[in-house]
């Protein structure tokens, strides 16, 4: 049996990898926002997110892991949308869409 320190060290390594991957994902989300700025596409694509969540959840080996994977990616996708909205707002796009919706 491994000792507790060794197990925690392994978790620490994985946690740093997760942080690096999260930051890389947010950089890519900024690129997605740039694409959407240039094409006028909406940030939220329910069909895409639902499909992605189903695919990722299916990768879980147990029901517990499937549930956790779904929660994890729902949060990651939410943060990705927030980042995209942030960039759209910085470019004046989000306010323009709201104004157009309400015809102000």
Please tell me what each predicted stretch does.
Residues 1-104:
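Domain-level signature for soluble enzymes in the chorismate/prephenate branch of the shikimate pathway
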């Amino acid at each position: 049996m491994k000792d507790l320190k060794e197990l925690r060290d392994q978790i620490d390594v994985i946690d740093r990898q997760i942080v690096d991957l999260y930051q890389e994902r947010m950089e890519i989300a900024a690129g997605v926002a740039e694409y959407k700025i240039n094409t006028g596409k909406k940030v939220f694509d329910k069909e895409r997110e639902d499909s992605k969540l189903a695919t990722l959840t299916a990768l879980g080996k147990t029901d517990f892991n499937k549930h956790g994977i779904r929660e994890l990616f729902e949060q990651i996708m939410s943060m990705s949308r927030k980042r995209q909205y942030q960039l759209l707002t910085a470019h004046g796009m989000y306010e323009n869409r709201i104004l157009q919706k309400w015809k102000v």
